[in-house]
Amino acid sequence: MNDRFRIRKLKGYEIIDSRANRTIRVRVETYDGIVGFGDAPAGASKGANEAVELKDKNGRVIDAVELVNTVLSDSLKDYDVRRQRVIDTTLIRLDGTQNKSRIGGNTMIATSIAVLKTASRALGQEYFEYIGGPRAKYIPMPLLNILNGGLHAGNNLKIQEFIIIPKNFDKFTEAIQASIEVYKRLKDLITERYGKIYTALGDEGGFSPPLEKTMDALDLVYTSIKSLGYEDKIFMGMDAAASNFFHESHYELDGKRYTAGELIDYYKQLADMYPLMYIEDPFEENDYDSFSQLQSKLKKTIVTGDDLYVTNIEYLKKGIERMSSKGTIVKPNQIGTITETLDYIDFARRNAVKTIVSHRSGETEDSIIADLAVGTQSEFIKTGAPSRGERTSKYNRLIEIELDYGLEFYGKNFYL
């Protein structure tokens, strides 16, 4: 075997994520000295069925690092980094649990990403080229979370994210520039109405003004868009993360109690009032039928499952059978390996489900999800506001890809 591709060793590092929590970085090195790194992100709002992180009782990842330096390094020694599926299958076998709890989804995804990057570098290819080959032709539309609520903020909004979607632009660079302008206009509006103190940023770079009602937040965002003349080019979205305001048999939102049926009517009202192109996790994570009913009522809105599917084909199959959503979030650390992530995206696309490659609220500067979105031809990428380095690293990577390789912007010819 060529020493350029043969794994010599793995090394684990305990690093810091954007929420001041400890996470793991893995370094893979071949005998020829080719090196690749992978970081594990972490969510604040987590699906009950996603891969379990391996963390120490005090929140650190010393045990995970030790596992990489010993068991994983020994087990993967001499493997060919180009054999991603074989390596990921080995990780899954070594773990031996359904929820990745022995090795940890965090340990596994950091290792899996590091293997991918090492192989790509050894071949002299860009990551997106290695992932997608000649299929990689488009830059995804960004979903920018510019106003935060829920578990991502310190205000009283129950809806977790208020999103802008720049669609009708010729280039990604134009789309991101318009989004920056809307973001800054929103900051000005918040300053005027509530004071500069409320322009502090949430976990994902969005603002967290002292709002309590969903419509107040949507009004602020829509006013920012319209004041710049972008109402025909920039659309809106929400991540409700509704499991967080579901209580036994009802939802508590905007100071009211809603049944699932009443909440469907409320979302329909919002979609009639605002250009809502996207709604994520509008119901609690086991309610496939309410997702389906909402999607059937909102023909021009991409109802999307995150906690509903947790990047797991078995859960997505249920959603497809019930026609629960037009879209699915893709978070590699929810499932634990690059191979399983690619299989999930392939399954979604074969069943006409749109894919949204997504960050987590606890991120690092690793920009691999940008390459993953391009390489898999995902329609969307969701990676926060156009601020904070762990968010902008992904946008800056997409700018590089567009300018260096001339790829087209997905929004230019995208139709619902």
Curated annotation (Swiss-Prot):
SUPFAM superfamilies according to UniProt: Enolase C-terminal domain-like, Enolase N-terminal domain-like
State the protein's purpose.
Answer: Catalyzes the reversible conversion of 2-phosphoglycerate (2-PG) into phosphoenolpyruvate (PEP). It is essential for the degradation of carbohydrates via glycolysis.
**What enzyme category does the UniProt record give?**
lyase
Which Gene Ontology BP terms does the record give? glycolytic process
Q: In which pathway does it act?
A: Carbohydrate degradation; glycolysis; pyruvate from D-glyceraldehyde 3-phosphate: step 4/5
Q: Which cofactor does it need?
A: Mg(2+)
Its Gene Ontology cellular component terms are: cell surface; extracellular region; phosphopyruvate hydratase complex
Q: Pfam family example for this protein?
A: Enolase_N
Record's keyword terms, sorted: Cytoplasm, Glycolysis, Lyase, Magnesium, Metal-binding, Secreted
Q: Which reaction does it catalyse?
A: (2R)-2-phosphoglycerate = phosphoenolpyruvate + H2O
Stated name of the protein: Enolase
According to its UniProt record, where is this protein located? Cytoplasm; Secreted; Cell surface
What gene name does this entry carry? eno
Domain of life the protein comes from? Archaea
Answer whether the UniProt record assigns the keyword Cell cycle to this protein. Answer: no
The EC code for this enzyme is 4.2.1.11
User: Which family is this protein grouped under?
Assistant: Belongs to the enolase family.
